[in-house]
Amino acid sequence: MELSEIKRNLEEYQNHLNQIRGSLDLENKETNIQEYEEMMTDPDFWNDQTKAQDIIDKNNALKSIVNGYYQLTNAVDDMSATRELLQEEYDEDMKIELEEEVQQFEEQIDQYELQLLLDGPHDANNAILELHPGAGGTESQDWVSMLLRMYQRYCEQNGFKVETVDYLPGDEAGVKSVTLLIKGHNAYGYLKAEKGVHRLVRISPFDSSGRRHTSFASCDVIPDFNNDEIEIEINPDDITVDTFRASGAGGQHINKTESAIRITHHPTGIVVNNQNERSQIKNREAAMKMLKSKLYQLKLEEQEQEMAEIRGEQKDIGWGSQIRSYVFHPYSMIKDHRTNEETGKVDAVMDGEIGPFIEAYLRKEMDSRDV
């Protein structure tokens, strides 16, 4: 790469950053950061821990955007200074190092822009992720356990905390259903890309004849709404609350007391379970919070569906809405049907490397908004 080409690239990066700045409203974000940090010095700040944590999360999110922008602009300034130095006094090792920095910088801008894509009203929230098998008994239940591990690994690799809220093991192997609470900034923003039906094609380890089987599992993802975000009144006459013994994937308190809670909301048929806490009271509180989140999400989806009908759009629903195929046999390939993103690195994906699929989905969503 010639120095003249490096100069052109750096000028393009600077122009790109100028365009980004035009849409960021940095001054307003910096003012908000200052206001949040003043709130955090108040002696009564932690009186309401939920509200306090919400302010901290919002402040951290703003600082990440603002600091990220300045880090990128400083990097361009540093690379430009190095290029000017090379122009005056050439050094081959320094030039090679600069070339690497320039080439890597494009990826840094891409990652920063991806962060900016998560600007939906609930993208910053924690996420509630549920997995359920399709028809097929043990084969589909085993597929759920594989997806469960994939999401757990993805969360570990990306700094999200995972809590197993509800877990029902399969009769022979696998999982009949599992609900995860995934905590971390933008957890919903990223994981909403996984909502839909996941299809597996492989030689079944449960088939003595070694035949190829196709299995399905559904993944549902909704935001974990804070109580102050939603206004949902639940009529006590509309719900039934049952207690049962926890049946989790392990743990000292499993099957000792009937601390687990199941709430059935009869008007909608929504059922939520919680067995994550040791006490029945805490499980009930958590289950009610999850029910409110589901009812609120249902309300939002109904409004979205009404708007889609007005616009003449039709969305796939149910088991027909396959978003991704995982083919292990007769060849190795994982393909996302929404974006055409694909890879032959099956083991890596099943070990949690689903970032490229999520990024491709978010970029497609951004492109559709720009049209």
Swiss-Prot record:
GO cellular component terms, semicolon-separated: cytoplasm
GO molecular function, one term: translation release factor activity, codon specific
PTMs per UniProt: Methylated by PrmC. Methylation increases the termination efficiency of RF2.
Cellular compartments annotated: Cytoplasm
Location, primary (coarse class): cytoplasm
GO biological process, one term: viral translational frameshifting
Alphabetical keyword list: Cytoplasm, Methylation, Protein biosynthesis
InterPro entries per record: PCRF, Pep_chain_release_fac_I, Pep_chain_release_fac_I_sf, PrfB
Modification sites for N5-methylglutamine: Q252
Miscellaneous remark of the record: The gene for this protein contains a UGA in-frame termination codon after Leu-24; a naturally occurring frameshift enables complete translation of RF-2. This provides a mechanism for the protein to regulate its own production.
Family: Belongs to the prokaryotic/mitochondrial release factor family.
Physiological role: Peptide chain release factor 2 directs the termination of translation in response to the peptide chain termination codons UGA and UAA.
Protein name per its UniProtKB record: Peptide chain release factor 2
Source organism of the structure: Staphylococcus epidermidis (strain ATCC 35984 / DSM 28319 / BCRC 17069 / CCUG 31568 / BM 3577 / RP62A)
Gene name linked to the record: prfB
